[in-house]
Every structure is written in C-alpha cells, then in structure tokens.
C-alpha cells in the first residue's frame, strides 16, 4: 500500500491512488488533470521518505472531478440584554480531487489501472424472472 501526505489549502491530507478527496477550491477546470508538488511524506513498500519540509522529486497526479459548495455553517452572535443579534451563514467552496498516481523521482510508485475513474460492469449479473415458476 503506497500513500502520500500532501499539503493543499493550508491543510495536510493523506492520499492514496484510486480514491477521491474533497479539498479547498482549486481554480482549475473540471475534468482536467492537476499535479500537486507539495508532498510532505511518501510511503511505499514499508519504505518511508520524509521531506524537510517537502520531498524532492515527489508529485501527486490527479483529476479534478467537480467543484461544489459544502454544507452551510450558521454563525449566530447575540449580546444578552441588548437587542443585538447577528445571524450569518457560510458555505465553503470545495473541489473533488481524484488521485491517479503518486510519483517519486520519476517513477510511478502508486497508480490506478489506466487512470480511469468509471466503474466497470463486467461482473454484474442480471437477475431475470421466468413465467409462472412457483414452488410446489
């Protein structure tokens, strides 16, 4: 199992190939590839490389799936015994980021199969019902 710890949007996040993550807004068009080079740690086959502060030559490649807004957070301020009340809401802009590969010194150490994100339907069985077969 290979993983990396990246920094994006002022936060640190543990990422693995083949998974998607909701991160702070990236000003990149959806359905395009994006590379993050702020990699703090890379782990592959029980071998851990820690950067100071970043790992040289390590990148995380992925695809921007979509942009959306998070859940609304209500901020309510009230001063007791006064008629002062403030109610405000905030919705954070979020980007859904699919990790395709983790690269380290020019080698791909973790990647998804073909970099695709669509599920396959090869193993799906369709159940059909036949006429009037009933248990006797």
Curated annotation (Swiss-Prot):
A Gene Ontology molecular function term of the record: structural constituent of ribosome
PROSITE patterns: RIBOSOMAL_L21
GO biological process, one term: translation
UniProt-listed Pfam families: Ribosomal_L21p
InterPro entries in alphabetical order: bL21-like, bL21-like_sf, Ribosomal_bL21, Ribosomal_bL21_CS
Domain of life, per lineage: Bacteria
Keyword check for Ribonucleoprotein: yes
Record keywords: Ribonucleoprotein, Ribosomal protein, RNA-binding, rRNA-binding
GO CC terms in record: cytoplasm; ribonucleoprotein complex; ribosome
Protein's UniProt keywords contain Cytoplasm: no
Family: Belongs to the bacterial ribosomal protein bL21 family.
Summary of the function given for this chain in its UniProt record: This protein binds to 23S rRNA in the presence of protein L20.
Subunit structure: Part of the 50S ribosomal subunit. Contacts protein L20.
Name by which UniProt lists this protein: Large ribosomal subunit protein bL21
Organism listed in the record: Gloeothece citriformis (strain PCC 7424) (Cyanothece sp. (strain PCC 7424))
């Amino acid at each position: 199992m290979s993983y990396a710890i990246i920094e994006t949007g002022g936060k640190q996040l543990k990422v693995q190939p083949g998974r998607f993550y909701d991160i702070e807004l990236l000003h990149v068009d959806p359905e395009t590839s994006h590379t993050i080079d702020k990699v703090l740690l890379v782990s592959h086959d029980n071998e851990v490389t820690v950067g100071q502060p970043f790992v040289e030559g390590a990148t995380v490649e992925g695809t921007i799936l979509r942009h959306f807004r998070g859940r609304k957070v209500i901020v309510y301020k009230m001063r007791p015994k006064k008629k002062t009340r403030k109610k405000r809401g905030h919705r954070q802009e979020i980007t859904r980021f699919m990790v395709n590969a983790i690269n380290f010194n020019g080698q791909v150490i973790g990647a998804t199969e073909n970099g695709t994100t669509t599920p396959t339907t090869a193993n799906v069985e369709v159940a059909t019902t036949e006429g009037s077969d009933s248990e006797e």
